[in-house]
Each structure stands twice: as C-alpha cells, then as structure tokens.
Amino acid sequence: CFKREEREFQYAGVDYLLAIQDCLVPENLPKLKQYIQTKSWWDTVDGLDGVVGSIVQRYPECKPILLEWSVADDIWLRRVAIDHQLGFKSKTDTVLLEEIIKNNLNQKEFFINKAIGWSLRDFSKTNPDWVRAFISAHKDDLSSLSIREGSKYVGSFRLLYLGRLI
C-alpha cells in the first residue's frame, strides 16, 4: 500500500495495521519506521503512532527505539515518538514521555510542537498535576502552541499562560 502513489492506499494500509496491531511484534518496528518515512504526512503518521504504541506497550524493551526516534532528523519519527503513548492513561510512562518531550523542546516545527501539546493534553486527563508541573518547569522552552494544547484541560492553570499565548 505504501508503494502506491494514491494516498487512499496508505490510508488502507494504516487501517489494516490498526486492525492487526495486537499481532505485531518488535521485529515489525523497522518496517513501521519505513512506512512512517514513506510519503509522510500527519494523517497517516498519526495512525501509525497508535500501532507503534501498541507494540511498545506490550514490549517495553522497545522504549530505547522510541528515544532514538525522538532525536531523529526526520520530524515524522519524532512525532511518533512523542505521541505513541496517546491513550495510555495511567499506563503512561512519564519518565519516557518527559525525556522524549525534553528532546524536542525549543522547536520551530509546527508538527512537533502540536504533537507535544497533544501528548500533554491527553495525559492531563489522567494526571493534570504532572502536566501542570511539566509545563511550569519547561514553560520557557515549550512553544506557545504546545502550552495552549497541553493546558487545555487543566483548568485555571491555563489562565496563567494566556498572556504568553496571545
């Protein structure tokens, strides 16, 4: 599917991988990496981060691979590294999340900053105190976009940063 020119084939490939994600194993990560880097755009990459996340959640020994991806030259690998724990809720590895986000602070790239914000926002539904503390500790290095997205569900805390966001 990823060799075909039309985007619809990549969508079909992502849908298929999502359907079989529980069958995938660490040995599939190199091929997934190739898919992430093939005709990359947010719509397919964001589907693949769930597939990668499923593998990492079942095989924690793969976490170092995501740390490697978090510093890659390829923004799409970095985006998957940042967002692969979306939906993990209380199973989120905060040490890994923090390290991956810290590897991507002070970025100008929209897709990286948006991913950081989404990752923080998603986890704030489970642990708003952790997200508040993280944003407070790194507010000078996070983009306004990341802060705005990440603080969306943390209540009045968000008001503290509105002056910087506007």
Each model region followed by its residue ranges:
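Alpha-helical scaffold domains
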Residues: 1-166
